[in-house]
Amino acid sequence: MWGYIHLISWVAIVVLTVTALLIYSKSTKSFTMLQMINRVFYILVILSGIMMVKYSIEQSWILAIFKILMGIIVIGVVEMLLSYRKQQKPTGMFLMIFVIVVVITISLGFYLSGGYPLFN
């Protein structure tokens, strides 16, 4: 169950972040609302990650710690990306870092979980 919550929350964070970046020029109110919803999903990701960490540590404790750090970095990069967008500063570098870090984090997550919940 926690795997599904974790996966759905990560997908929601990515979708909300991309949506917020795309609609900023049209509606700052909607941008702020999406940013707040994103923060709720951060809490879900952190809680579900805590519940699943014991299974990841059984697989490889070094990779589990690395994945935890990468997850924290993703949240930080998303916050920086959205705050730079709100301040109308260039976001290209953070967007590139966001894509790279998300791909690494997702890959580690599926490796440590043995593909669960998508590839049972």
Swiss-Prot record:
Keywords: Cell membrane, Membrane, Transmembrane, Transmembrane helix
Any Gene Ontology CC annotation: plasma membrane
KW Membrane (keyword) present: yes
Topology class, membrane: Multi-pass membrane protein
Residue intervals passing through the bilayer: 3-23, 33-53, 62-82, 92-112
Domain of life (superkingdom): Bacteria
UniProt-annotated location(s): Cell membrane
Similarity section: Belongs to the UPF0344 family.
HAMAP family per UniProt: UPF0344
Protein name: UPF0344 protein Lm4b_02292
Species annotation: Listeria monocytogenes serotype 4b (strain CLIP80459)
